UniProtKB/Swiss-Prot annotation:
Source taxonomy: Bacteria, Bacillati, Cyanobacteriota, Cyanophyceae, Synechococcales
Name of the gene encoding the protein in the UniProt record: ilvD
UniProt cross-references to Pfam families, sorted A to Z: ILV_EDD_C (PF24877), ILVD_EDD_N (PF00920)
Catalysed conversion reaction: (2R)-2,3-dihydroxy-3-methylbutanoate = 3-methyl-2-oxobutanoate + H2O; (2R,3R)-2,3-dihydroxy-3-methylpentanoate = (S)-3-methyl-2-oxopentanoate + H2O
Protein name from the UniProt record: Dihydroxy-acid dehydratase
Cofactor(s) required for function per UniProt: [2Fe-2S] cluster; Mg(2+)
Amino acid sequence: MLRSDAVTKGIQRSPNRAMLRAVGFGDSDFGKPILGIANGYSTITPCNIGLNDLAKRAEEAARQAGGMPQMFGTITVSDGISMGTEGMKYSLVSREVIADAIETACNGQSMDGVLAVGGCDKNMPGAMLAMARMNIPSVFVYGGTIKPGKLGGCDLTVVSAFEAVGQLTSGKIDEVQLTAVEKNACPGAGSCGGMFTANTMSAAIETMGLSLPYSSTMAAEDEEKADSAARSAEVLVEAVKANIRPLDLLTKEAFENAISVIMAVGGSTNAVLHLLAIARTAGVDLSIDDFERIRQRVPVICDLKPSGRYVTVDLHNAGGIPQVMKLLLDAGLLHSDCRTVEGKSLKELLADVPSEPPAGQEVIRPLSNPLYAKGHLAILKGNLASEGSVAKISGVKTPVLTGPARVFESEEDCLAAILDKKIQAGDVVVVRNEGPVGGPGMREMLAPTSAIVGQGLGDKVALITDGRFSGGTYGLVVGHVAPEAAVGGTIGLVQEGDSITVDADQLLLQLNVDQAELDRRRAGWSKPEPRYRSGILGKYARLVSSSSRGATTDHAD
């Protein structure tokens, strides 16, 4: 019995079949599984510009494997293009829109399974949220990573262009050099090339078994990526037959495996937010504290940008995520019995993967010689973040900083101050009212952090925010501060010049103001007026949960 029988079987469904005949169904097709192809193709961004070819390959393969594919579109927002603008407020919102769209199309048409094709950052968690909500057989196809740009013998990514802006304002480069970086940073199709958010989330999905082995690190423009899309469709047909569903795979152990891999590869802070959201939707008891627990035992073994030397295609050439997983598995750092969409256990999947990283490469290190002995995503708490905050500490030379607060009510005000050279070594920059409710939309702060790095202050200044950071951010940065300012969090009580301690060693984020003074400030605090009362941002601000619970919109806190 298929779910799609609800629209294809029986005399009463003759009108339904009439419409299906108009889109290509014949007599022999009724009774085949109807498979949604959720296509994120868009010319908005290089991340998604190649997705149509992958979706068509998957569509063809699904039909040849005995399914009836039905393609439909979903949206994307380009984080890189909207970064530093009001448009960035729509980025995290788009995760919910993508999830809602896929759920609506698949459930509205009684589809038997779904293959989602995505590229830019929110495509991955958006698709995963939909898959967890629907719990129908599902496979994710990642659009692939962009190849590195080249300039003067150096690899470039889009983050190189953001940092070049700071280098220009500090006099390190001129406009000719800035333009050269701009023209060479993004050479073609694919998602941003370091271990930024898109590649982090695709690695997590591969680890959790909802995409195929090696698929998360393939280059977008290589033929093996198209072949992988076709194979993914074949696997989906088999998953429908075997009734393998997302909630069979998305167990607590699978999430722990994903966190372990994210730590090992040096992945994005956004993975914390997205995995919390997916777990909540899947009914899995995952908390922000689980990330810290796993961080303590899993080292960083991949030397990847933004803080390292290499890009994701280099990781692929060194063995990809399966090689990383095999090293962790052999060390007892992964749950070996987790299943994949192909019906295999993780142990079975990795049986033929070498137990040592390939010789002659420095992208993946052995666990005996890690880049960092512990994971790089630290969970900081204190009176500034009673529900927690997320710090990315890989490559940080100064993990402890106590300094005066420089308070900004928006990203724009902060960036202007940095570019005007008003931020000095030792400052603790506070950007607030950028959280899920306050922004709304929890913008990423890549422009300010890149400007700080570009001016040579990356190891000398801390930045904390109730907003987010791009996967391309590095330095002493602390995001996802919860509770956020807009709902009464302590970050909203900070005043210019207050002493703040950021201590990544002791996992502390503390406002050094006595409790009596904090109580006085809190008594005088009033909830700010919403920045938007209508439209999708107004709706989002009314519905969204705390970042410490994934910033979802379909669960009441």
